[in-house]
Amino acid sequence: MYAAGSRGHSPAFLQPQNGNGHRSPGYVPGKVVPLRPAPPPKNHASAKLTSRSQDAPATFAFSPEEQRTPSESRKRKRHKNTFICFAITSFSFFVALAVILGISSKYAPDENCPDQNPRLRNWDPGQDSAKHIVIKEGDLFRLTSDATVDSIVIQDGGLLVFGDDKDGSKNITLRTRYILIQDGGALHIGAEKCRYRSKATITLYGKSDERESMPIFGKKFIGVEAGGTLELHGAQRTSWTMLARTLHSSGLPFGSYAFEKDFSRGLNVRVIDQDTARVLENEKFDTHEYHNESRRLQEFLRAQEPGRIVAIAVGDSAVKSLLQGTIQMIQDRLGSKLIQGLGYRQAWALVGVIDGGSSSCNESVRNYENHSTGGKALAQGEFYTLDGQKFSVTAYSEWSQGISLSGFRVDIADGVKLHLLDDVSTWEAGDRIVVASTDYSMYQAEELTLLRCPECSRSQVKVKEIPQYLHVGEIIDGIDMRAEVGLLTRNIVIQGEMEDSCYAENHCQFFDYDTFGGHVMIEKNFTSVHLSYVELKHMGQQHMGRYPVHFHLCGDVDSKGGYSQPASVDGLSVHHSFSRCITVHGTSGLLIKDTIGFDTLGHCFFLEDGVEQRNILYHNLGLLTKPGTLLPTDRNSSMCTVMRDGVFGNYVPVPTTDCMAVSTFWIAHPNNHLINNAAAGSQDAGIWYLFHKEPTGESSGLQLLEKPELTPLGIFYNNRVHSNFKAGLFVDKGVKTTNASASDPREYLCLDNSARFRPHQDADPEKPRVAAIIDRLIAFKNNDNGAWVRGGDIIVQNSAFADNGKGLTFASDGSFPSDEGSSQEVTESLFVGESRNYGFQGGQNKYMGTGGIDQKPRTLPRNRTFPIRGFQIYDGPIHLTKSTFKKYVPTPDRYSSAIGFLMKNSWQTTPRNNVSLVKFGPQVSLNVFFGKPGPWFEDCELDGDKNSIFHDIDGSVTGYKDTYVGRMDNYLIRHPNCVNVTKWNAVICSGTYAQVYVQTWNTPNLSMIITRDEYPSHPMVLRGINQRAISPQYQPVVMLEKGYTIHWNGPAPRTTFLYLVNFNKDDWIRVGLCYPANTSFQVTVGFLQRQNGSLSRIEDYEPARSMEELQKKPSERKFYFDSGTGLLFLYLRAHSHRDGHSYCSSQGCERVKIQAATDSKDISNCMAKAYPQYYKKPSAVKRMPAMLTGLCQGCGTHQMVFTSDPHKSYLPVRFQSPGKAEIQRGDPSIISVNGTDFTFRSAGALLLIVDACSVPFRVKEKRMFLSADVSHMEEYFKASIPPRSIVLLSTRGEIKQLNISDSLAVLGLAKPAHLYSKGSVVFLGFSGNFAPSWTKLFTSPDEQGLGVLEQFLPLQMEEYGCSRTGSVHRRDLDLLQQALKVL
């Protein structure tokens, strides 16, 4: 609608009468109003037209004809005008419709797309680094081209949107020092329902030593203040997956090959396996000098099997003695055309295929002149392995500057193909990916670049670079060790612009590169923040608060905080970061999902102050987490000792106890949720739960209603940890919450050992305990601990540990558990000592050695002497049950045991530790080991070492039911019928056992000597816990209903406390304590409440006149002092019940206090006088049981496989393939399917057809082909294998030729296999329109077997064409939904 203005001016547009220029109340930035015409103006029916005659009356006279003629004329004119208007209107309508349809067909507006908001104006600020931009109310900008500015502030309704187009062809880079989004401001790149298609890059530039910092945010940042909106949504892509097939170093299963030598005279020959690219034979034939060498070459070629690849290169000269028969053999079998005319010192190279004819032969010759051939004679052929990997074989020969050179290469051609677990069709050529280490060193992670690969399936990619390390892509020994593969590239990039090297005050003594990157910081009360599928590169600074993504003191960011759309980060790629990945600081309820953190400094996923709760970390990947400088816990050893600004005085930090804790997931409060995450390589720990005594940092002073130490654990489900040095999972410790001072000079926030996790209902210690459930943890290739878990009630279940220095260690406390009555349990779990993941030397792997199982070289967790343990007993009480142990075999250098104990243990070990329903595989040589003096164990003489013990409840460890296992030299627990197991350094005894906790006052460096009356020649000397302390403590394990005497290596203590620990009601022992003859005593007993330190029911012990009186009334409170021997005798008898796992009775800890008065300073050792007077003949209180026979029913975990995709079903398949010698010995051949053995002893081939869509598995057919019938297998393969079937084949004995190569190719191999003269053949294939990554062919040379092979095959996959009757239950998704609900 418009009105006519002055003549010659354009029409002036007017506002519609029903509209206005302001936003509607429901306007949402980024939501676009659909394109449609404005409504017509309202019809004002009440308006009146005034007759012109009323203003200027006039009279005109016409004849009737004249009057009629103008009337008719006007009527015709109106009709004409009506037609013209109609025509124009119609034409305009169709033109407009065509335009609209044309526009719609090109780029249909979408109200979900922020860049299609019709109110936006295109904006091009140009390239001006001095321009300060303020986008304010009324400024609604669409950035359409590259720009460089100084800074951008968006405020008061201002809006900045990155332009996009339908085909994603825009490529917009915005360079700025910072972007500050203030109240009412918004920055949008894409939206959740309209993801950005083009490439958008925000580059944050500037140096740390130029210009002043902005308040709060500093430099090089995107900052979101209260009321600000940041919405970044890139193209949705698979963030990370895992390998589905092992990626070998160099891309080939047997590695690449390279050889070069000068003056290697004659014909140098290599024979290469056409199926695997393995160099089989390496020979040199001096056909220049010797005719016999020519004959030997002829026979050598005659013996080669058809299809073998042969490479030949001349060294120096080869023709003088080259016989015609040999030349003919080369022509006939390799198709050479140049060998016949080869001359003196001519360079010649050939690559051909035996019996492949001239079409498969590539050869080259160069003439020799003046000691040179003027270049290389180069021959090359390209081939494919059975896995479909393309490789090349190269041979070359030349003379250069008078030197003869010849050589060979076998390597990858046209890129390496990766087989992945998930659909990665959204990954594109040019993208960067990272493949995680599957060895001890996190530095074996590799960055690779994707190539175009039209032949790849949806789960395959091809990479440009040659892998340097082995990356496992299999389930090995029942444990998922498949390497994580993460996509680093995103189409929205936020990056820091970096200098070439470190400068200014940026810790250049530790880093030789620039670490002053950009950062994104979000402040409290933001309006909306959602980041998805964004790449953050070169972000973070080695300065506090400057992290790639930092939610800073935001409080509750979910519905509890009033957000209808809770804040989230999803699908981010944070890599090459200079300070952390995602920092959650004083923020609760944040969802962090599908995010990768790679190659970062300091804790990666970082919960900071100990107040962060309800945050959800779902399916995130962190790897290559390196030390940083910010906090003591970030630092490595050198940083720790050098950075001393935060300590008091001249204190030098101790790296192992103050620092060295950098972790991929740093969880500072237990009430957070971790589901489906992978911590795939950190300098110290993968996942670390720590417990703050009080809020720290900027949250200091907040009053938490619930103490973290007492708060129940959030969801922990299906997380994996590997390639970490200190621990995969670490649940223990806290940080120091006080400033450095003279009394404690350590730095604020350094590691602190005072925290104890003891979860209770509502975080109230007076309410019932709540067990922390660690469900489905996979921990492998961690140098020290797979998992170290300290706390109250904790249950580890459905978990797997492999190739760790120590699989799992539970800890509670040194003397008494902090959480009285608590215990720890591991159940339904698998422990593997040395798996078939042999590792790969390199990438900072420090330790190599020989394996105990098969004596093959392998990487080791520590040095060659380090004792490997599966489950490590420490403190207690713990319960190990329903678990399986495999492959713990010592070597001459080291011990390896399924169950072991903490080494150099000065603390207590309770006899209430117990084991039941455990299973040991055939390759377990040491079920348990108690240590011996030597490397790592040192003298093995600390108090905890000597008192190591556990209860074998059902005999599943020892074969003796209801017995206790202790160290062999411990005579406090023995009786005559105990069974010694020398190789365990153990003794197995029946009986009942408890502990006496002895504490003395003012007696530093005093050792206690305790002797059982039955074994006076075998006393136990205890140094005491904290021996240098004023009040040392001792805690021997004792057999009940026996007598003991206690002596000292110095003057007797004046005050001694004896606590009855783990005594049930009426349990007793008699003790005699050594004192000088002139000592007087006051002995009392009471019940100590350890929670508050109160003492109740105090009674005095009365003196007895004789030993006989004392013995007749053992239940009364009496003592007897034998001044002749110096022994004060009394009975320690429990008078109250003990509940559950409580160390003390339900009334408190029964404590006897002895006050001794004497002026003697003599050493109080009464051994010589006490015995033989008080000697007793050794006897058993409880009869030793008979040894069990038969298999342990119900022992071990019922799970055969532990994977990171537990919603999938995997079928364990095991082949036992003996060679000729084993067959002659009578060993059977076996195919085992899910534990069911199919055995055969006749020569031939066994074929099993398994339904790929049935769970549980179903064998459709079992078919045996004897040697005479093997020729019929081809026909069977062609006609009888139904679709959607798994094909399992194993041969036995000599089969000269299997005619099934073509059939195996149809069942999943990339080409027909070479099956001539094989000792054994094992094949796993699939019948269907899909080639799974698990299809494999194994062969061995003639007369050799393949040993034991194990594979785990997925069942009921959609790719197989299975029609599932019901949807797969995803417990992880159920738990995610549960966590998202705010209570």
UniProtKB/Swiss-Prot annotation:
Ranges facing Extracellular side: 104-1383
Tissue expression summary: Widely expressed. Strongly expressed in endothelial cells in the subcapsular sinus of lymph nodes and in the liver sinusoid, two primary sites implicated in systemic hyaluronan turnover.
Residue span(s) of domain GG-type lectin: 255-412, 1208-1366
Record-linked SUPFAM superfamilies: Pectin lyase-like
G8 domain mapped to chain residues: 121-245
Domain of life: Eukaryota
Site (Essential for hyaluronidase activity): H248, A303
Consequence of substituting H248N: Slight suppression of hyaluronidase activity. Hyaluronidase activity is abolished
Localization: Cell membrane
Glycan-bearing residues: N292, N914, N1234
Cofactor: Ca(2+)
The PbH1 repeat ranges on this chain: 669-691, 711-733, 791-812
Entry keywords, A to Z: Angiogenesis, Cell membrane, Developmental protein, Glycoprotein, Glycosidase, Hydrolase, Lectin, Membrane, Phosphoprotein, Repeat, Signal-anchor, Transmembrane, Transmembrane helix
Sites of Phosphoserine modification: S10, S53, S63
Recorded effect of pH on activity: Optimum pH is 6-7.
InterPro entries: CEMIP/CEMIP2 (IPR052252), CEMIP_beta-hel_dom (IPR055401), CEMIP_X (IPR055400), G8_domain (IPR019316), ILEI/PANDER_dom (IPR039477), Pectin_lyase_fold/virulence (IPR011050), TMEM2_PANDER-like (IPR039473)
Main location: membrane
Effect of D286N: Strongly decreased hyaluronidase activity
Transmembrane regions: 83-103
Gene Ontology CC terms: cytosol; nucleolus; plasma membrane
Its biological purpose: Cell surface hyaluronidase that mediates the initial cleavage of extracellular high-molecular-weight hyaluronan into intermediate-size hyaluronan of approximately 5 kDa fragments. Very specific to hyaluronan; not able to cleave chondroitin sulfate or dermatan sulfate. Has an essential function in systemic hyaluronan catabolism and turnover and regulates cell adhesion and migration via hyaluronan degradation at focal adhesion sites. Acts as a regulator of angiogenesis and heart morphogenesis by mediating degradation of extracellular hyaluronan, thereby regulating VEGF signaling.
Similarity section: Belongs to the CEMIP family.
PANTHER family in alphabetical order: CELL SURFACE HYALURONIDASE, TRANSMEMBRANE PROTEIN 2-RELATED
Protein's name in the database: Cell surface hyaluronidase
Protein's organism: Mus musculus (Mouse)
The organism's taxonomic lineage, starting at the top: Eukaryota, Metazoa, Chordata, Craniata, Vertebrata
Name of the coding gene: Cemip2
